[in-house]
Regions:
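Extended alpha-helical interface modules used as scaffolds for assembling large macromolecular complexes
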Residues: 1-174
Length: 174
């Protein structure tokens, strides 16, 4: 009887762990979607265009010398030190909006998502007593979720900070 109870308790615990891991995985997948779809963007530590900007919710607008990158949608975080530092309220708000519009509602609270991300080992760092890290961004200190960058985007080496425009194939008269 004790062995059966222990097995049931372990099975129930595993269901909880699996559910939290799947919530964390869904959160990451939805985060990738909102960035790729242009519903949100992530800036560098100072609020400007980051490396890997196209994968982080930025797009090129304008042409020629007037071409520039612009963040799309709401700013939900910052990227530096190989981490994405997310504002939990902003990120969950945008992600919830997408998840409910596609019929796959992410109903978890910010706190339960942060806990699920921590338990799934998806947080790069967090304070000992909370699932957030106090971080300085854009001249202010705030508590943010710190995710490993490689969970959200693939990195094949350092990208150029700004786009390289290739005019070699153009017929430019001088």
């Amino acid at each position: 009887a004790k062995a059966t109870n222990a097995a049931h308790n372990l099975a129930n615990f595993q269901v909880i762990v699996d559910k939290e891991a799947s919530e964390a995985e869904r959160f990451i997948q939805l985060l990738q979607s909102v960035l790729v779809m242009g519903r949100a963007h992530v800036a560098d530590k100072f609020g400007s265009m980051p490396d890997h900007y196209l994968a982080l919710g930025w797009k090129m607008i304008g042409t020629g010398e007037h071409q520039r990158a612009e963040g799309q949608g709401a700013k939900i975080g910052w990227v530096f030190d190989d981490c994405i530092h997310l504002d939990p309220k902003a990120a969950v708000s945008v992600i919830r909006s997408l998840s409910s519009s596609n019929g796959n509602y992410l109903g978890s609270t910010e706190r339960s998502l942060a806990k699920a991300l921590r338990e799934a080992n998806m947080l790069a760092k967090c304070d000992a007593d909370r699932n957030l890290t106090k971080t300085s961004v854009e001249g202010r200190r705030t508590y943010l979720l710190c995710l490993r960058l490689d969970l959200v985007i693939e990195q094949d080496g350092p990208p150029p900070k700004s786009p390289i425009l290739d005019y070699s194939g153009d017929d430019i008269p001088f």
